[in-house]
Amino acid sequence: MAKQSVVKTKKRVKRVITDGVAHICASFNNTIVTITDRQGNSLFWCTSGASGFRGSRKCTPFAAQVAAEKAGRAVLDYGMKSLEVRINGPGPGRESAVRSLSNVGYKITNIIDVTPIPHNGCRPPKKRRV
C-alpha cells in the first residue's frame, strides 16, 4: 500500500480593515451592493437577485434591504466599523439599503450621491408608446 503524504498548506490570514466604502447601485430593475476597502479592492458584493428575489420583486426596497444586510454581515468578519456610502442610480432601493447598513451596526461617516448627471450630453431615447 502506498504511503499517504500530508501536504501542509499555509493558513490564509484575514486582513483587518476598520473602515471601507459601500457602493450602492440602485437601478430600476435591481440593486447591487458592493463593499470595498479604501483602495477600492472588493471585499463582498450582493444583489437583490442573488438574495433570492426574481422578476419585479428585485426592484423593491425590501429586496435592497435584504441585499445590503447580507453584504454588511459578511464583511463584519474583517473587523470593519465604519462605512462611507456612495449611492449611484435612481432606483427605489436607495434609502432602504443605507438604512439597513446602519442597522447592521456600521457607523456611516458620509453619504455621497455619485449618480452621473449629463450637462446636455447624449440625446435621450425616444418616449415609449404603450
Curated annotation (Swiss-Prot):
Keywords: Ribonucleoprotein, Ribosomal protein, RNA-binding, rRNA-binding
Ranges in coiled-coil conformation: none
GO MF terms held by the record: rRNA binding; structural constituent of ribosome
Domain of life the protein comes from: Bacteria
Annotated transmembrane regions: none
InterPro entries assigned to the protein according to its UniProt record, in alphabetical order: Ribosomal_uS11, Ribosomal_uS11_bac-type, Ribosomal_uS11_CS, Ribosomal_uS11_sf
Pfam families (UniProt xref): Ribosomal_S11
Gene Ontology biological process terms in this record: translation
Disulfide bonding pattern of the chain: none
Keyword Ribosomal protein: yes
Gene3D superfamilies for this protein: Ribosomal protein S11 (3.30.420.80)
Any one cellular-component term (Gene Ontology): ribosome
PANTHER family: 40S RIBOSOMAL PROTEIN S14/30S RIBOSOMAL PROTEIN S11
Functional note: Located on the platform of the 30S subunit, it bridges several disparate RNA helices of the 16S rRNA. Forms part of the Shine-Dalgarno cleft in the 70S ribosome.
Sequence similarity: Belongs to the universal ribosomal protein uS11 family.
UniProt xrefs under HAMAP family: Ribosomal_uS11
Subunit structure: Part of the 30S ribosomal subunit. Interacts with proteins S7 and S18. Binds to IF-3.
Protein name per Swiss-Prot or TrEMBL: Small ribosomal subunit protein uS11
Organism: Xylella fastidiosa (strain M12)
Gene: rpsK
